Amino acid sequence: MSPMRRLLIALATATTAAALLAGCSSKDTGGPLPEAAPLVKESATTTANLKSAHLALSVTGQIKNLPVKTLEGDLTNQPTTAAKGSATITMLGSDVDAKFIVIDGDLYAAITGDDYDNFGSAANIYDVAAILSPDKGLANLLANLTDAKAEGRDTINGQKAVRVTGNVPADAVNALAPQLKATASTPATVWISEDGDHQLAQAQLSPSSTNSIQMTLSNWNAPVTVEKPAGA
């Protein structure tokens, strides 16, 4: 039985529902905006060197083959790529809250209670840990962002950031989120911290006018420990 089918069956028997909040933002003004291209380039380098972060992810609309509605958790790539947290997953018309662990490439999920099942390769469902991958994740998105334009300033989770719009080639989009199956460039907006080493505060991909994926990062490089579930 495929990992996705196993997850479908497990979710179909669950009755809990939840809603997680993504990063809060507000408008900010004042002073001329920095040039977008150098800012994005510096942020791409910083993001490629990121060792860990807290992630709040939300999906607006419906994206085929992407069951995640909201997700919140901690990611790390030290000593290996891993993640842990909770997600609201939409299946068969119902929203179900599940805790998850991604480690050694496998996805473990607890649909109800604290008993985790191994659903096999995370890449077959959604590999959230890949977001920190320098080659496939947000760093790669930034490195390939074209037509970058600084549009304004916002405050993301208390962090002042420059809002930059642009387009991301299909290859970079599909590396980050294969479920999108992009065939052309996708509009994107990124929010980059104006101070310091220009950490990426938030990114949004908009494959259509009604569908988008938003990823908000915080707690950059804070220690994160991920372990296999007991008995796994």
Locate the predicted segments by residue.
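Subset-of-secretome marker
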Residues: 3-9, 25-232
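Sec-dependent N-terminal signal peptides
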Residues: 10-15
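Hydrophobic alpha-helical membrane segments, chiefly transmembrane helices and signal peptide h-regions
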Residues: 16-18, 55
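C-terminal motif of bacterial Sec signal peptides marking the signal peptidase cleavage site
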Residues: 20-23
